[in-house]
Amino acid sequence: MAQASDVHEWISFEDPTEDRTWLIDATYMRSSHRCIYGEGCKGVLDADATEMQQGCCSYGAHFVDDDDVQTVVRAFVNVKPHQMQFHAEATREGFLEPGEPDDEGAPTTVTRQVDDACIFLNRPGFDGGTGCALHIAAMAAGERPLDWKPNVCWQVPIRLEHETDGTGHVTSQLREWKRRDWGDGGS
């Protein structure tokens, strides 16, 4: 039986400009939920990991496509060593690696992990600042962090998924991330 917290109202509409249906979680979008790194986030691991200050960075970033990868490749050349705790490792060994194949078996790309979290995550105590090195560097450059970061990193806590049926019709669903969405670690 569903718990009250799992019951949501949804809004759906057809996009007249393309063969697409939008499903939007109205309950979540109207909620007062906040997801701000460093403000008590319990993280996405199996148990409360607030003290680790990893937030949703425990598994690295999973890129949505090559454009997403290229955004970070272009941004990285502007990140200074004093802004990124693992800059030397990223320069020497790279910051990307192959991920698990997607649902259709196609290859994916993810950020490398260092010490069980994203290579771009500056850990507590780093002189350049705790949190995402891409975010820190973008702010220092006077630019928007969303222009430097992987899509998933600036979209969280909102999840956008697209499914295409056999006729080519796309259903796009806009909703909250749930712990189960993070896979084995977030259940």
Predicted regions and their residues:
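Short loop/turn segments that flank or connect secondary-structure elements
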Residues: 1-187
